[in-house]
Regions:
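Short hydrophobic/aromatic beta-strand immediately N-terminal to the Walker A/P-loop
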Residues: 67-69
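The conserved Walker
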Residues: 73-74
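Acidic, metal-coordinating catalytic cores used for nucleic-acid/nucleotide bond scission
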Residues: 149-158
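Conserved substrate/cofactor phosphate-moiety recognition/catalytic segment
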Residues: 82-144, 156
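Conserved phosphate-donor/acceptor-positioning beta-strand/loop module used by diverse small-molecule
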Residues: 166-187
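Conserved lysine of the Walker
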Residues: 78
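NTP-dependent small-molecule kinase module
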Residues: 3-51, 58, 214-273
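Phosphate-binding P-loop
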Residues: 58-65, 139-140
Length: 273
């Protein structure tokens, strides 16, 4: 299968991505069909072993069977870390806030979340969670690498997701972006989508209380706590460098879990048929 697109992918492409015999073509600077023809012609000139190697690259993609949980309250800077430190990794971001903001804009509701729009906002929030859940299921079905972005207030939900992913052979990590309450409140005031102050305080307290539990859920060496109380300039330099080193070192390791290796073996056998 060859997916042809210019701007955005749909659910079909997301489902087949990294599956056997799937080639994805994003047409940057050309028409999709023409680019696809060039790829096909290039593959025709390869030997059987070279062709098999080309197909196997998807199975051994660095992000396969890797899951990174991102934790931190409103104003912690975790979204900036997601957009910057994970850029170019190919990992799939699971974040209900993205779907929520998109839904609010489509419904002409304010992203500053005023009290008078709470009823309609909650309806959109539920839809956003359903959409995110469907995306998560599709990504996991293909064993794609994940970035699960949340405040991580709900400890039991995080534990359930970790248990599920580990049962499928995933290697789970956490990046905890930590700030004090004063910094979180100030950054919340400066962000486009402000959260009511009482929610920032409540979320900050709950997330802080969960740090110890997170350290028990994620084994030593698989949790990074980032101090993000410093200036924006320091965030761009030292903080992102620390996060990038942690992420890249984990992505360089191939899956060692027996469940993951069994799944990869099965996928390779399907390719040989």
């Amino acid at each position: 299968r060859i997916a042809l697109y210019k701007k955005e992918t749909g659910p079909v492409v997301e489902y087949y991505r990294n599956k056997p015999g799937f080639i994805e073509v994003k047409a940057e600077g050309g028409e999709p069909k023409e680019i696809a023809k060039k790829i096909i012609n290039k593959l025709k000139g390869k030997t059987l072993s070279e062709f098999k190697q080309y197909l196997n690259e998807g199975v051994y993609d660095p992000g396969i069977f890797k899951a990174f949980f991102l934790a931190g309250g409103p104003g912690s800077g975790k979204t900036f870390v997601t957009q910057s430190a994970f850029a170019g990794t190919g990992l799939k971001v699971v974040n209900s806030d993205r779907a929520l903001v998109s839904g609010l804009k489509k419904a002409n509701l304010s992203i500053k979340m005023p009290d008078e729009e709470e009823y309609f906002r909650n309806i959109i929030r539920q839809r956003a969670k359903q959409t995110t859940g469907s995306m998560f299921d599709k990504y996991v079905e293909g064993r794609l690498g994940l970035v699960i972005d949340s405040t991580a207030r709900d400890l039991s939900s995080i534990q359930d997701q970790v248990n599920l992913l580990k049962s499928l052979g995933y290697d789970c990590h956490m990046i905890f972006v930590n700030t004090n309450l004063e910094v979180a409140l100030q950054r919340n005031k400066n962000r486009p989508r402000q959260v009511p102050e009482y929610i920032v305080k409540k979320n900050h307290s709950e997330v802080q209380q969960n740090i110890g539990a997170f350290q028990r859920i994620f084994s030593p060496g698989k949790m990074l706590i980032i101090d993000n109380n410093r200036s924006e300039q320091e965030l761009v330099t030292q903080t992102l460098k620390t996060a990038a080193r942690f992420i890249n070192s984990r992505l360089r390791t191939k899956p060692e879990n027996g469940i993951a290796l069994s799944w990869i073996k099965k996928e390779l056998e399907l390719k040989r048929r």
